[in-house]
Amino acid sequence: MNSIDLASLAAATPTLRHDWTREQAAAIYNLPFADLIFRAQTIHRQSFDANEVQCNQLLNVKTGGCAEDCGYCSQSAHHDTALPASKLMDPKKVIEGAKAARDAGATRYCMGAAWRSPKDRDMAPVIEMVKGVKALGMEACMTLGMLTDDQAQQLADAGLDYYNHNIDTSEEFYSSVVKSRSFGDRLDTLATVQDAGIKVCCGGILGLGEKPTDRVEMLRTLANLPQHPESVPINMLIPIEGTPIAKTAKPVDPFEFVRTIALARIMMPKSDVRLAAGRTAMSDEMQSLCFLAGANSIFIGDTLLTTPNPGDSKDRMLFARLGITPREGAPVEAHSHDHDHDHHDHHHGHSHS
């Protein structure tokens, strides 16, 4: 892509496509780094304020004991990670946490439960949590595993804004990471959520042992859905002792991570791209390159689901150095304030959203 093509991009309106080929996606991912970043940043500015980042806070409302066997996750009952299983939290405690998150600048509250799927008896307290968060003027996001049509409709009726359900990696590599469910199961749940009218938060994890082509294919799967996920979390694996993948995980090259962010931004120009789990292992310079490449959302707070996060004071300092301001929430009545999961997916001992 030459400089004339790039210059013409600046004035263009982003086109939402759902027909990306492997070759097209790979060609963008492999552009010279400066051209890739310029293209991503240009497309980013067509839909977003380049100096604004949306802030989310994540809470684990039900920890551990999960029946799934996701190879990266500390919350799986299949792995010996010394993480005790807990019962579902009291909705009142969850709502107290949401208030504190709102006061710290979060406009969205993400709640993760380590389940394969919720039981019907779990729905009443979960719905109470959603309604309580919404009453604070915040957006509510949940990640609870696979849903039935009826459960998705109940969540929609309660006012749930987002549902997180990550595809983690490419379809080809998926069975190397998770064996207790299929890639198709993930896509089925995404369709169930979208059919209920809930926005989708769906991304993946880098550092599972995948190849760069798997990262490209993961994003191509999302970009070719009938509707792009409104939120796309990109997580860096935090290897957790006791999980199978911790033994084989290899660090991701920082520039490869930034390329993945840029490709997500270019292929899904209207979606929020979240720099999710793994920021504690990233330098300020790497995070700033991610923002330059089109990331415009983070998790704030000291912890995600079961893994560490930089913390509000460190994030405030970084934002100040970069001239970034947190996105304001949408005005709501009585308020001006607006998921391993940790790989924001409840199955991620990391963070999901």
From Swiss-Prot:
Pathway: Cofactor biosynthesis; biotin biosynthesis; biotin from 7,8-diaminononanoate: step 2/2. GO terms for biological process: biotin biosynthetic process. Its EC number is 2.8.1.6. The keyword Translocase does not apply. It catalyses: (4R,5S)-dethiobiotin + (sulfur carrier)-SH + 2 reduced [2Fe-2S]-[ferredoxin] + 2 S-adenosyl-L-methionine = (sulfur carrier)-H + biotin + 2 5'-deoxyadenosine + 2 L-methionine + 2 oxidized [2Fe-2S]-[ferredoxin]. Residues 344-353 have a biased composition (Basic residues). It comes from Rhodopseudomonas palustris (strain HaA2). Residues 51-270 form the Radical SAM core domain. The lineage of its organism: Bacteria, Pseudomonadati, Pseudomonadota, Alphaproteobacteria, Hyphomicrobiales. Binds 1 [4Fe-4S] cluster. The cluster is coordinated with 3 cysteines and an exchangeable S-adenosyl-L-methionine. This is Biotin synthase. [2Fe-2S] cluster binds at C110, C141, C201, R274. NCBIfam families: bioB (TIGR00433). CDD domains: Radical_SAM. Its cofactor is [4Fe-4S] cluster; [2Fe-2S] cluster. Belongs to the radical SAM superfamily. Biotin synthase family.
